[in-house]
């Protein structure tokens, strides 16, 4: 296996969903940063009226001052949508984890958290993305009204406890949180395909039928394979691995390298 670079630089962002009327204001964010020795607010546009400093989109705009720049691990991140200004544009959500229903704009308001413009070109680099997710976990631990995190590359909404536990375990050396940072969908022909894996490795995963006849078992296999592929950085040529039951599985990238197919030999 060789490392393949992901092309999805613009997707390196997430959304923090708060109960209606519970978004934090700039004072709450500054107090939050003051409690963590590794976190700082490095720019507040309320103290600088230069319109050019305002981030575009996501509810940000000249004169609104509804954002702050945060510094963590030597990297800057923009937090957009703080109260009392307008919330960030509510994200597209297609998958849910540890949530009873898909969240929507009727019940929640969003803040966007993303790499600052000076480092956004780093895209899906692992150090940058890990710091972004670690910062989101900090928010979950500090704000009780934060109900869920939406990971944009997978269009997945993740309940606060599941997000924090799975992400923290990965950051501490555990398995990649495939349920949440990726998702799985069943195709019309009965295969199981990943959603959002291309952010991490530039490729999606397809588990071919009949290997995915048992959806639960296929999802477990998908979780294992996603962890394997993220660790490896992608797949550039045919490979074989052993399944949990000892049978051999074949992995093959498509001609354009965009899809990795898996089947039992």
List each model region and its residues.
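Short, compositionally biased low-complexity segments
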Residues: 4-5, 101-112, 191-201
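Conserved aromatic-histidine-acidic binding/catalytic patches
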Residues: 17, 120-128, 210-217
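Short, well-ordered alpha-helical segments
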Residues: 26, 30, 126, 130-133, ...
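Structural alpha-beta junctions
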Residues: 35-43, 133-148, 230-237
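Internal, hydrophobic cores of structured domains that mediate oligomerization or house catalytic pockets
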Residues: 75-176
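Aromatic/basic-lined ligand-recognition segments
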Residues: 92, 151-265
